[in-house]
């Protein structure tokens, strides 16, 4: 068994008790009075992933600079990963860009709720509500959701945490990793531009001077390029893979427990296909994302993961493809397309 890194030990010391406290709170017998709901399903999964009598399995963390093969997750800096990517380095493990300085003012819950109201105050938003019996997200008026978030989740009192997974990015400049500006990572934006020109009959390299109307064809790839996420403390999302390909997510505030399946052999993936987000792998490892951390999940790889929110959190993220692995990415896309149960989002129609 490889020796644990200092970073792994520090993470377990810093967050192990916090995670266990949240799990005990979720297991409170009072919550069983809610009947059969999404919350009950989530508790069943959490109890299987993290049995009460075991320590939290923190991932083996290693520096990307050493290309440590025995690490579950690489950690790096913005400068180091940008330099490596410029030399055609291929990322093959989940990687965290550590504690970026976001350079933003007004961060926090109030700022987020004000932005949500400014953008969508008279609209509806998709909400994962664990107090319902439906797996599908519930469409709720934004004003009601804002009120519920302001009230705050209180698991012992029966106010269960909600999850907003289908938000547009609310801002001007998303905090994407700088290396994504390299030409090899321009695959999805280029596809989007080409297909938009094909479907509209207007191949114009510039801003549109008029509204775009597309008949009988949905233009939906852009929605994958950037997105925003919000979840309250205790919100849980079961195991899934991201579609269409690689993902980056930056934690703007809060705390997230990211849980990875460590054994993705053929028999486990068959179970995953059959069970979807009810699947629990034989073994897992986890990391805690802190404010400013950016998690990058590599292109062309199937990385089943689940997420538990440790503190009210907002994330910004996006999707990308790597031209150096484009054939493998297409294989991944095809694999997901015939196994839709493994992803919590549909493949953009423009890629089908």
Protein language model regions, located:
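N-terminal accessory scaffold of Fe(II)-dependent oxygenases
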Residues: 1-296, 304-352
